UniProtKB/Swiss-Prot annotation:
Pfam families: TLD. GO terms for cellular component: mitochondrion; nucleus. This is Oxidation resistance protein 1. Belongs to the OXR1 family. May be involved in protection from oxidative damage. One of its GO terms (biological process) is response to oxidative stress. Residues 114-342 form the TLDc domain. Residues 68-94 have a biased composition (Low complexity). Keywords: Mitochondrion. Residues 7-58 have a biased composition (Basic and acidic residues). Residues 1-98 are annotated as: Disordered. It comes from Candida albicans (strain SC5314 / ATCC MYA-2876) (Yeast).
Length: 345
């Protein structure tokens, strides 16, 4: 019984000879196909193992355009270039040296009423264009006390050609008579009125007025005052009006000294761009700023009186002291000066 049971659970053994015979009986082309498939799979596996990671393509460098190179962008991104330029401009502006001390020349020793001092001049200097801030010497060209009360004299002294003519005469006098004779023999006498002196550099001017109540006010002018034959305004947006205002510091919350009774502060009124009525002058008056027939600063031909209105050109307040809610302020001129900023040659 045990023998029969063992025979029943055993699996039938496959005859090795028969299997080998069956394999041999398969067609040869099928065996060849299997071998080819196996070899291809081995090659794919070996390639996948030995395959190196693909390198990412390098970005293509674009050549900058001609206008881009002029602007300094080159092949860089415009946004990054603008950021770099802005940072460089900020850093360069912060590296500017401080302005040198200001020198005021032209006062005579006998002049008693000097309207412009260093504090007021520096307040004006901080607001003028940077190219004129570099000049540390301001020259007095007209003074009511030194040159007399005359509008024509004011126009003549403010003319840069007249100033240059005086400068050349002064230099010739300093060099001596013999040197001037030799120069006239070589190049001719250039001091005669028929020669026209063209200034090589531009200048700007500061007008300072002091009235009978000791108020100081005036204007910064981009051009010299001159008589205009036709009603035509001149000057540019660099001009502005200014005044020195008296106030009571004890009424301020942040006042340092509550016992102080009166102080003076500088106020400027810049060009608004609403209109171009900046400067107009003729043989009858000088007007700076105008709207609706009212001038920010008006001086009559006598140089003894004037009036100030609030005008749209500068958006200014009344320059001289006036009652509250007044529409204009009239004044009597006690002193008047014109200063030149910039060199003549």
């Amino acid at each position: 019984m045990s023998f029969l049971f063992r025979r029943s659970i055993e699996q039938p053994r496959v005859n090795e000879k028969e299997t080998n015979k069956e394999v041999k009986d398969e067609p040869q082309h099928q065996q060849q196909e299997k071998e080819d498939d196996n070899s291809k799979q081995e090659e794919l596996l070996s390639d996948s193992v030995n395959e190196k990671p693909k390198e990412q393509p390098k970005p293509v460098k674009r050549r900058g355009t001609f206008f881009g190179n002029l602007l300094g962008n080159g092949s860089k991104n415009s946004s990054s270039a603008s950021l770099n330029s802005s940072h460089s401009s900020v850093s360069s502006s912060s590296k500017f040296p401080p302005l040198g001390p200001l020198t005021l020349t032209g006062y005579k020793e006998s002049t008693h009423h000097r309207l412009l001092d260093s504090e007021l001049a520096n307040n004006i200097r901080n607001l003028i264009p940077a190219r004129f801030q570099l000049f540390d010497n301001w020259e007095l060209v007209y003074s009511l006390e030194q040159h007399g009360i005359s509008l024509n004299t004011l126009y003549r002294n403010s003319n840069p050609e007249h100033q240059l003519r005086l400068l050349k005469k002064q230099k010739a006098a300093e060099k001596g008579f013999a040197d001037s004779i030799v120069k006239n023999m070589v190049v001719g006498d250039t001091s005669r009125p028929r020669y026209s002196f063209e200034p090589k550099r531009s200048q700007s001017y500061v007008l300072v007025i002091k009235d009978n109540h000791n108020n100081k006010f005036g204007a910064y002018l981009s051009e010299n005052l001159k008589p205009m034959e036709h009603r035509r305004y001149y000057g540019n947006g660099e001009c502005f009006l200014w005044k020195c205002e008296k106030y009571d510091p004890s009424k301020l919350d942040h006042a340092v000294d509550k016992r102080a009774t009166q102080e003076i502060r500088f106020k400027a009124f810049m060009y608004t761009g609403i209109n171009d009525n900046i400067i107009y002058s003729n043989h009858d008056f000088i007007a700076i700023g105008s709207s609706n027939g009212q001038n920010g600063l008006f001086i009559d031909k006598s140089l003894l009186s004037g009036v100030s209105y609030s005008c749209d050109t500068f958006g200014n307040e009344i320059l001289n002291s006036s009652p509250q809610n007044a529409k204009f302020g009239s004044f009597k001129i006690k002193g008047l000066e014109v200063w030149r900023i910039g060199t003549l040659e």
